[in-house]
A protein has these predicted regions:
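Generic structural signal for helix capping and beta-alpha/helix-loop junctions
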Residues: 13, 36, 192, 212-213
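Active-site-flanking alpha-helical
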Residues: 73, 171-172, 205
Length: 224
């Protein structure tokens, strides 16, 4: 199997971490997002969405992190995507929630406009309004994650690690670029620490820290 990805991207890191944890052998093909390779015709022919990751398994091609995680979990027979209907539905629910609620506000509304020039709004007023709106909503979703999804649980679906944790942890740790303080949400900080304690975390996320986190150390960002 081949994975088109970028090792620092929020969407690629969940797949790479899951594959590393499960010993899944992938041929990694880096798409240079910083150079705009995803917008070139050659990659557009692979994924018309012009986004990573993309998984190729023989003649089968699959896009979207959540879909790829489910596919790999099925192939590996991983308990991280349980077969029992209600447990699996809960994992699907949490993954949809991360993608449609938390990521929309925390990543696309609050962080990306501050981190990525291509996401910055056209003028300062619109930029400030966008960040302020997203900040209000992101804090709400962080409280839902802290109080309802996590609570006293070890992971977002209960006591067992699932692919929903792999998806969500990449979104939350994007906040490290802007040095976000999650201490108001102690269950979230506990869960982040647990996920980062995985033996594969450092090697999989090395490029993320070198390319995004470390270069932003002196940049000023809006706080939550």
């Amino acid at each position: 199997m081949k994975l088109y990805f970028h090792p620092a991207s929020t969407t690629s890191r969940p797949v790479a971490l899951f594959a590393a944890d499960h010993g899944i052998e992938l041929e990694y093909r880096v798409i240079d997002l910083l150079a705009g390779e995803q917008a070139q015709p050659a990659f557009g022919a692979i994924n018309p969405n012009q986004a990573v990751p993309v998984l190729e398994d023989g003649g089968f091609r699959l896009t979207e992190s959540s879909a790829i995680l489910k596919y790999l979990a099925e192939k590996a027979g991983s308990p991280a995507y349980p077969r029992e209907l209600q447990q699996r539905s809960r994992v699907n629910e949490r993954m949809d929630w991360f993608n449609t609620s938390l990521s929309r506000e925390l990543c696309y509304g609050f962080l990306y406009p501050q981190i990525m020039p291509s996401h910055k709004r056209a003028d300062d007023h619109t930029q400030q309004q966008t960040i302020a709106w997203a900040k209000r909503n992101a804090t709400r979703w962080l409280s839902v994650l802290n109080d309802r999804w996590l609570g006293d649980n070890r992971y977002v679906c209960g006591e067992r690690l699932t692919i929903a944790d792999y998806l969500g942890i990449a979104q939350l740790t994007l906040g490290e670029v802007a040095r976000l303080d999650y201490s108001r949400w102690p269950n979230v900080t506990r869960w982040i620490a647990r996920m980062k304690d995985r033996p594969t975390w450092s090697s999989v996320n090395d490029a993320f820290y070198k390319l995004l986190v470390q270069p932003s150390a002196q940049v000023q960002f809006e706080a939550l």
